[in-house]
């Protein structure tokens, strides 16, 4: 284990993740540095490299007209977060996250940020509930459905494409889970309306998302994150989120700050990835995908340290 300064419990200094990642990119041997405990806080960053311009089969584009997801990026994401996951929190984290829902085999669930389907399949496997995973990226949804087929969960945890800016669902469900997706939606009110309509009476709504107080929104690190995030963020404050629940008569039972947990998941994943990279050779395209993905999460960490928060919201729809 190590302390917050990067030293292990015996007091020996360790090389910081930034230095190790740069050394991996340049192909340096770190053994000498590890013996001497040398490190530099000012390690230069490799020049940002553009992602390949041609999208892999299907999938949407980011705000600059480049593929939002590629096979290489998915490979990196699964190394970071675990098989079937493309955001923080793998199989071990999901039970903590969804505990308020009280999931059971009689329940139907919508997962509005399905990604590769890891959360959907974890809920279906662990609790026996019937989950429909919805994902904005066509490419991710296809890859997620392939993974559901491989696990024999094509009926219990199918992954489909949808448009969060125009959300409606033909059947009412017992629960909705939406994990760090609302922040990039422009029309949050219409999405809230759609979620409320999709819930059965006494239905559950569980969301985690990035929020920020107006006084902190102008912080440099937050602005850098907003400018460079692949999908344009449209952040609300915690109070705005709470008001959206109240306006739809959804009984908000939990509105808690889980920033420290989220930050810890990111830092632990990046450290694990760096250790993996030091043992494996990757082709140039994958190395670029690694740097792009790590930089994305480092920017999110910087925004968090500048005041952006991650909150978990849990609400109940009243009986009719």
Question: Which role does the model predict for each range below?
Answer:
Residues 2-66:
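N-terminal auxiliary segments of SAM/dcSAM-dependent transferases
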